[in-house]
Amino acid sequence: MADEIRKGLYRISVPLPNSPLKDLNSYVIKGKDRNLIIDTGFNRSVCYEAMRKGLAELGIDLQQTDFMLTHMHADHTGLVTRLATQTSRIFFSRIDARVFDGDHGWQSLVDFAERNGFPAEELQKALASHPGFKYSPQKKPVFTLLDDGDMIECGDYRLRCVATPILDDEGKIAAG
């Protein structure tokens, strides 16, 4: 079900089965020429059906729809390659896009664990059952990269991108 939050701005609640988070709030901006979906849910059938139902209720044509992913976690990115069409742009942070390019993704974790003696077979089992891996996009998305301060316009809305990294460029964690 889609709830109108403001004129032209809607929320679709996407269930996240077996997750302590319970649901993801996916936001949809209906524009005159293009629509924008913000975050998609896990790449699972139940999530896909909830999203499709909400989009159908709103009369969203995916051929006229772009996507913005707020960060790299599978509950936010999982369905994007199932929903996006040839005409869709997928907006994503330049920093988080490195994960999908292999700089800081699952393979780095696997390599690190193996170098430090974690048994490869156990690692593959653990990875196969991890929801962040299991429910991620089917294929690598093609991104339109965003940087801090960039603007996205859709309908009556202008969204400003604000980078809020927990790691600096050298990989040091920020705390405080």
Regions found by a protein language model. Give the residues of each.
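A short catalytic or substrate-binding loop motif that flags glycine-/basic-rich loops and adjacent residues
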Residues: 19-21, 144-146, 164-168
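Structural motif
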Residues: 34-36, 66, 157
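Conserved beta-strand hairpin/beta-sheet module of binuclear metal-dependent hydrolase folds
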Residues: 2-58, 173-176
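Active-site HxH/HxHxD metal-binding segment of metal-dependent hydrolases
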Residues: 43-47, 56-152
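Core dinuclear metal-dependent hydrolase active-site scaffold
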Residues: 149-175
